[in-house]
Amino acid sequence: CYNETMSDPLQGDPLDADVTPHDSTISPGATGPGVTTPYLDSLNEAQRAAVEALDGPVLVLAGAGTGKTRVLTTRLAHLLHQGRARPYQILAVTFTNKAAREMRDRVESQIGGAVEGLWLGTFHALGARILRRHAEVVGLRTDFTILDTDDQIRLLKQHLQAENIDEKRWPARALSGLIQRWKDKGLTPEKVSAGNAGDFANGRAVALYADYQERLQTLNAADFGDLLLHCLTVFTEAPD
């Protein structure tokens, strides 16, 4: 499992590291209006316009290799440099740990110092951090374990055996894929419609999904799909 080994791609700490406004610092470079901004010098006119538009949302549409990541990271640095936001007020999401690390490095290079408290990482890493704070909303404790794919399949195999379902005919890996697709769509067992239920184990997939979720809760565990699905539940049921 990933409970102890999986790290936030930017903080370098376990995913359950708690980041609060009190941890949010920028050091040692000076920030605020009037401070020089040499990091803007490498941008072209269109890139600079996107970075300096701080009073509202900006949509950047550009092809590969045109500097979208540079614009995003420089915009983050500019928000901090101009004192328009504290690190803990910024959320930046990427798809890979490598991209997240590179973005953090670029921002710190442009700011001229370490940035602590910035919410920057992959969807799953940030989801895990949010869940550590609000685990009780989904029936977990804050020290819940994050299962990897092998752990998940092992647990499903045990469940199929307990239900006397032929695992050779109905593989646990296939059930795992089905459950993850439902979770990717934001579907809890209660929300899976008859049309989406599939024919796994002669129509028993939804019941197996529900039992699997109950088992995870008993074990105080979550799989990768839960890191996003549970966040959706948290945002819906506890918006404050």
Question: What is the predicted role of each segment?
Answer:
Residues 48, 239-240:
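Short hydrophobic/charged patches on amphipathic alpha-helices used for structural packing
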